[in-house]
Amino acid sequence: MAQITFKQEPITLLGSQVKTGETAPEFTLLDNDLNEVNLSTYDGQKKLISVVPSIDTGVCDQQTRKFNEEASQEDGVVLTVSVDLPFAQKRWCASNGLDNVITLSDHKDLSFGKNYGVVMEELRLLARSVFVLDKNNKVVYSEIVSEGTDFPDFESALEAYRNI
């Protein structure tokens, strides 16, 4: 188990961290209409998976906007994952006029968080992280932000995404 901090407090991450070069593990998430979505839903597409603790916070909001603005110009898909309820994710998208943002919820069973090693045990939230997968689901970039209130390395993640 790895440790990070959140607001400078130590946090334990559950699960096995996904590393560059590995095949990404499967997951089951809920979309905004409560439909189950799996990694295989996006087979044949490159993927930028942006993981945030809660979509309604300032840093998470900015992270979601930045990745969608920058990466949506590429051929692929950008997924934002949090444990927010699908209704809250849908409301956030609607209130911000962002119809093209794909938000997915891991609130049901934390399968994504456990499989990717990003469940913050003490908070039952997901650690801020970014995973870039090629069309065959090979992990080409993986970052778990060491302080949960900091931004990820946008440029490195976007460069990895563009270079697929």
UniProtKB/Swiss-Prot annotation:
UniProt KW keywords: Antioxidant, Disulfide bond, Oxidoreductase, Peroxidase, Redox-active center
InterPro entries: Redoxin, Thioredoxin-like_sf, Thioredoxin_domain, TPX, Tpx_CS, Tpx_Peroxidase_subfamily
A Gene Ontology molecular function term of the record: thioredoxin peroxidase activity
Active site residues of this protein: 60
UniProt keyword Oxidoreductase, yes or no: yes
EC number(s) per entry: 1.11.1.24
Pfam families: Redoxin
Domain of life: Bacteria
Catalytic activity: a hydroperoxide + [thioredoxin]-dithiol = an alcohol + [thioredoxin]-disulfide + H2O
Residue pairs linked by disulfide bridges in the UniProt entry: 60-93
Subunit composition and interactions: Homodimer.
NCBIfam families from the UniProt entry: PRK00522.1
Protein family according to the UniProt entry: Belongs to the peroxiredoxin family. Tpx subfamily.
Note: The active site is a conserved redox-active cysteine residue, the peroxidatic cysteine (C(P)), which makes the nucleophilic attack on the peroxide substrate. The peroxide oxidizes the C(P)-SH to cysteine sulfenic acid (C(P)-SOH), which then reacts with another cysteine residue, the resolving cysteine (C(R)), to form a disulfide bridge. The disulfide is subsequently reduced by an appropriate electron donor to complete the catalytic cycle. In this atypical 2-Cys peroxiredoxin, C(R) is present in the same subunit to form an intramolecular disulfide.
Record-linked HAMAP family: Tpx
Function text: Thiol-specific peroxidase that catalyzes the reduction of hydrogen peroxide and organic hydroperoxides to water and alcohols, respectively. Plays a role in cell protection against oxidative stress by detoxifying peroxides.
Protein name, per record: Thiol peroxidase
Native source species: Staphylococcus saprophyticus subsp. saprophyticus (strain ATCC 15305 / DSM 20229 / NCIMB 8711 / NCTC 7292 / S-41)
